[in-house]
Swiss-Prot record:
<dbReference type="InterPro" id="IPR036282">
    <property type="entry name" value="Glutathione-S-Trfase_C_sf"/>
</dbReference>
<dbReference type="GO" id="GO:0140547">
    <property type="term" value="P:acquisition of seed longevity"/>
</dbReference>
<dbReference type="InterPro" id="IPR004045">
    <property type="entry name" value="Glutathione_S-Trfase_N"/>
</dbReference>
<feature type="transit peptide" description="Chloroplast">
    <location>
        <begin position="1"/>
        <end position="57"/>
    </location>
</feature>
<keyword id="KW-0346">Stress response</keyword>
<feature type="binding site">
    <location>
        <position position="107"/>
    </location>
    <ligand>
        <name>glutathione</name>
    </ligand>
</feature>
<dbReference type="GO" id="GO:0004364">
    <property type="term" value="F:glutathione transferase activity"/>
</dbReference>
<dbReference type="Pfam" id="PF13409">
    <property type="entry name" value="GST_N_2"/>
</dbReference>
<dbReference type="GO" id="GO:0045174">
    <property type="term" value="F:glutathione dehydrogenase (ascorbate) activity"/>
</dbReference>
<comment type="similarity">
    <text>Belongs to the GST superfamily. DHAR family.</text>
</comment>
<feature type="binding site">
    <location>
        <position position="68"/>
    </location>
    <ligand>
        <name>L-ascorbate</name>
    </ligand>
</feature>
<feature type="binding site">
    <location>
        <position position="219"/>
    </location>
    <ligand>
        <name>glutathione</name>
    </ligand>
</feature>
<dbReference type="GO" id="GO:0009507">
    <property type="term" value="C:chloroplast"/>
</dbReference>
<keyword id="KW-0150">Chloroplast</keyword>
<feature type="domain" description="GST N-terminal">
    <location>
        <begin position="70"/>
        <end position="148"/>
    </location>
</feature>
<keyword id="KW-0934">Plastid</keyword>
<feature type="binding site">
    <location>
        <position position="133"/>
    </location>
    <ligand>
        <name>glutathione</name>
    </ligand>
</feature>
Amino acid sequence: MAVLLRTTTSATTATSGGSSSATALLATTFRRGGRRLLLLPATRGSAPRRAALLTARASAEPLEVCAKASLTVPDRLGDCPFTQRVLLTIEEKHLPYDIKLVDLANKPDWFLKISPEGKVPIVKLEEQWVADSDVITQAIEEKYPEPSLATPPEKASVGSKIFSTFIGFLKSKDPNDGTEQALLSELTSFDSYLKDNGPFINGETISAADLSLAPKLYHMEIALGHYKNWSVPDSLSHVKKYMKTIFSMDSFVKTIALQEDVIAGWRPKVMG
């Protein structure tokens, strides 16, 4: 069974003088507890260009996104950092989209037909279902180049080893095996990079590399906090500020997984 969460658009906004402008604002509608919540994203760029961009996007067909359903709460997005990366990209591009939540423990036949390996995320682009977050985000960047989220090649791998070292530390049963130090080493390197080049990986503007790394840092924070009683040291102030900044972005808040789901999602690796 899949649950559909649909994005909507608002064609006009009121000006200070009480008139309406033609600026189209994209919004995502959620239903929680019988209430309808409308969330509006922030936008970047000059006002006329932004207005034209959003007007065009508002009339576009919503992208179809298959995502993991929550393990703990019905009709809620689940814990997949790769899916959140894709959703963050779509949000930052101000594109409308429909999410189809899939119970990965009981994969329906329709889902297995479009994703034979049974993996998420998978997005419908140009009438084709596309898998793998790397491929999906690159395809979205090419099809919708504005606003640009491209990360320069020389910066694209910044922070890329943090996730694997986090997993190594999380799974470790030996406090002296060096896995914690390996993670701290990667975080320290990233902190130094942000100090000299931040606040984001590509400087002043957020880019694809941030949208890939941030969901993984969120999982790191929740999972290590729960299973290891561990947190990023205060001495790594630039990393902590980076996480706080991105975690508070509208697009991140709208696509975030519940802490309970992150904890449940990592439990098999910890207990295995």
